[in-house]
Amino acid sequence: MNTDNWTKKHFTETSKFNWNCPHCKSKSLEFLKDKFITSETQESKNYRLKNDDWEIEWITLNISGQLKCKNCEEVVYFLGIGNPQENGHYDQHLDEFVSEYETYFSPTFVNPTIHLFEIPKDCPELVTDEIIASFKLFWCDLESCANKIRTSLEILMDEFKVKKYSIGNGKRTPIALHHRIEKFPKKEITNILLAIKWIGNTGSHRSKDLETIDIVETYSLLEYALNKLFKDTEREIKKIAKEINSRKGKRKRK
């Protein structure tokens, strides 16, 4: 996962979108300038009319646009907010600074869902569904996004049959996720899962302290953990080598 692709959430009409196409997974999404629509919000208009000290950068825009995959022609639709920002330059011929404004925008909704990392195909369906739900929230609500990631860990514990309740005095008491992770059978990723859980906890508390980089780093940890569980390259390489050595030649194919 290239974290630099996802820490950037502010774009212009000339930006390059290094996102994977939802359909073919290639990085071939291209911004369609003729499909880009902006409209000043009514609140922004009212503020502009009532304030003499108003400046153009204070405009708030609702935006909509499309990206099209050059490889498979899938179209991705997005909505968001934006505002004009000055990108002036010094003109040597005029010997003066020339003011130019460009619309910067941030998507708050993207459809079809962009996957921030590739989920292994052998990952349990319920875990996959919860992670995809978090991808949808990444653009608009980081706290809810983090909470979805945390829920995916709860489901992962269920899939691995990690004890969910303790019984005492005839009562069934839920076991905290932290303690369930400590009992997770794949000890090599326990610390990874605990780190993911802590960020998920922050989202659950609605503290508004989370930043985009926090979620992106958490996705990096989650990607690593899932690959170790369901797409262990090292284990596959060792398996291939073992089969070749046992046959003293090429592996048997189906």
Indicate where each model-derived feature is located:
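Short recognition patches in nucleic-acid-associated and regulatory proteins
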Residues: 3-6, 17, 23-58
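A long, hydrophobic alpha-helical segment
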Residues: 124-142
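Hydrophobic alpha-helical packing segments in soluble, helical-rich domains
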Residues: 142-164, 203
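Charge-enriched, short contiguous segments at helix-coil
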Residues: 191-246
